[in-house]
Amino acid sequence: MRFSVVETFHGHRGRLGNICGLRIGTGEQCLDTPTCLLYTQAGSAPHLTRDMLHKLGDVENLPALFPLPPITSFVDSVMQFGKGLGSFVALQSHPSFIRIQDPMVTTPSGFNDKAGVSVWDQGGRVHLNPLSFTRMMEAFQPTCYQALCDSDTPQDASRKRLQRAVDRSVSLLDQCLAMKADSSCLQHSAILGSVQGGYNRDFREISAKETAKRDVDGFVIEGFHVNGPQTKSLKFEEVAEILEEVIALLPQDKPRFLHGVLRPEFILKAVLYGIDIFDASLAHAATEAGCALVFNCSSDKDLELMLGRDLLDQELEMDMKNARHREDFVPLLESCACYACTNFTRAYIHHLLNTGEMLGQVLLSLHNIHHFLGFLKSIRKFMVQHGAKELNGN
């Protein structure tokens, strides 16, 4: 996996970039950044078949995020299958990225130790050490995976907990790197190191410097939250200063990831601070809540508004279970060209959700993913246009 910076911008660490060498099967793909990873659960985009997913157009080759917890239960089957995770779940056209925890599920606290990290699948707790984890990765053969790390650092974490998270994450990374180097199955898989330290600048600096010394292909900024839909309440201003300091310590020639159910204004500001890749879990969180994403993001003026203030909840999403939509015979979003908006009304989707019909969540998923991907496309366009203005001194 090779990352190159296409353009940087005066006054910001934000950049347009390109990732090449993303291995899928015997071929390779490239990816423009900033962007996001398609969110999956148990190997599929929730509520959507592959054919329905690909009706979204630009999504066909979008890299997919596979949270580790819901896929640990079928690792033996994937191993016997012998062709890797992407082919096993019929998403072989999507580069596969494996993350240790699920951004949609709150991570229980207090279950990591110096030997390894705990995740939770349908059967309960699974404790992973570097050896068992590497064997899983050999079965899954991902395009890219996050090394084991201890990200159990809620906002009220003690200095002792932060110290352990930093020390353990570096130790686990070293072990994962050594085992990857000895594995013939993982020679073409990229590996990501994680920057820990919670909200403590000293620990963040130690973690960033130590992780940057390792031979990793990119960096995941971890430890600002413990995952789950409640992450949406995190304000960018709470992490801005620490994030800026961390980014300054990381090399320019490697991508930076930040995962979680993050609001659009958080994502936009994080891009300007130098984050390259997010995930689309916000779209899934909205669907699970019975909501349609409706925030305006198609114009420069819309994005400038996000930089100036936080969106109101009613500006972000619309509750489609609300009775006021019973006779609302317009699309979810008038300007949207997705399958749901071009064929169905708010009234019908409201009816589907309130009668428990699966089609309701299918249509919401199609709309929310389409809208979220359009948002990332608007950010790239915004950066191109405003970068040119800044570089020209206008």
Curated annotation (Swiss-Prot):
Its cofactor is Zn(2+). Pfam families: TGT. GO terms for molecular function: metal ion binding; tRNA-guanosine(34) queuine transglycosylase activity. One of its GO terms (biological process) is tRNA-guanine transglycosylation. It comes from Ixodes scapularis (Black-legged tick). The keyword Protein biosynthesis does not apply. Non-catalytic subunit of the queuine tRNA-ribosyltransferase (TGT) that catalyzes the base-exchange of a guanine (G) residue with queuine (Q) at position 34 (anticodon wobble position) in tRNAs with GU(N) anticodons (tRNA-Asp, -Asn, -His and -Tyr), resulting in the hypermodified nucleoside queuosine (7-(((4,5-cis-dihydroxy-2-cyclopenten-1-yl)amino)methyl)-7-deazaguanosine). The keyword Cytoplasm applies. It comes from the Eukaryota. Its main location: cytoplasm. HAMAP family: QTRT2. This is Queuine tRNA-ribosyltransferase accessory subunit 2. Zn(2+) binds at C336, C338, C341, H367. Keywords: Cytoplasm, Metal-binding, tRNA processing, Zinc. Heterodimer of a catalytic subunit and an accessory subunit. Gene3D superfamilies: Queuine tRNA-ribosyltransferase-like. Belongs to the queuine tRNA-ribosyltransferase family. QTRT2 subfamily. One of its GO terms (cellular component) is cytoplasm. It is found in: Cytoplasm. Binds 1 zinc ion per subunit.
